[in-house]
């Protein structure tokens, strides 16, 4: 599970636009991890039994992210104390932890809403030599087989994969759950496993951040005023 800035937060950069300024930024659990991957894992546990372990790669500031997952219903939580900005490093840490745990299913959000990389699930699957189903909007598990549905151009694709497998969750796999007070109170005192790793530095670095250009103003033209529309398209938009 990963964190992401709340979409209402003001984004700024420091150190000559090489660092993201986290001052005053409210972080949330990445929705694809929380609403879809985590909740569907809990639904499967409730229907079939089992245990749900949440895993995050990041610093101590990830504790609130992990504890929310516990409040929603996860059984165990692990934080790997390492930088989370490099996708390959994150994937390697996840795979190194999971390789001898005997997990039947690894569920990831399809992407984070701040980076939109969509690469960690595939890297984890490759490192663990497991099959991958990406962008699954529906997931059912029975008799050691996961049945997934995902959107394709013009319809839905149905895939079956033998477990263990890695599946990245897209919108539609589950619905958001709000943690209740009992879950919140229990999560506050539940032990977290923190794993320190050697050579945890990211293998890439950010050379520069840039804000997207400001959007141009939108002009509305009365449908009856074709002459004005032609003038605007010619003189301002310069498309005719």
What do these predicted ranges mean?
Residues 1-240:
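N-terminal glycine-rich FAD/FM-binding segment characteristic of electron-transfer flavoproteins
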């Amino acid at each position: 599970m990963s964190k992401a800035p709340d979409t209402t937060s003001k984004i700024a950069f420091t150190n000559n636009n090489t660092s993201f300024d986290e001052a005053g930024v409210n972080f949330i659990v990445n929705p694809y991890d929380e609403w879809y991957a985590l909740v569907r894992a809990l639904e499967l546990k409730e229907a079939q039994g089992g245990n749900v372990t949440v895993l995050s790669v990041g610093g101590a500031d990830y504790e609130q992210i992990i504890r929310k997952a516990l409040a929603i219903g996860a059984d165990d939580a692990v934080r790997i104390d390492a930088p989370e900005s490099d996708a390959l490093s994150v994937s390697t840490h996840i795979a190194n932890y999971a390789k001898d745990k005997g997990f039947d299913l690894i569920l990831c959000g399809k992407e984070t809403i701040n980076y939109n990389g969509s690469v960690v699930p595939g890297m984890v699957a490759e490192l663990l030599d497991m099959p991958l189903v990406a962008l699954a909007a529906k997931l059912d598990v029975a008799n050691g087989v996961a049945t997934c549905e995902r959107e394709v151009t013009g319809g839905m694709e149905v895939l079956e994969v033998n477990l263990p497998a890695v599946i990245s969750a897209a919108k539609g796999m589950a619905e958001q759950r709000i943690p209740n007070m009992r879950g919140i109170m229990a999560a506050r005192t539940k032990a977290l496993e923190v794993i320190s790793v050697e050579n945890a530095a990211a293998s890439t670095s950010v050379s520069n951040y840039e804000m997207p250009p400001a959007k141009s103003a939108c002009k509305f033209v009365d449908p009856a005023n074709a002459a004005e529309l032609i003038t605007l398209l010619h003189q301002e938009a310069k498309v005719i």
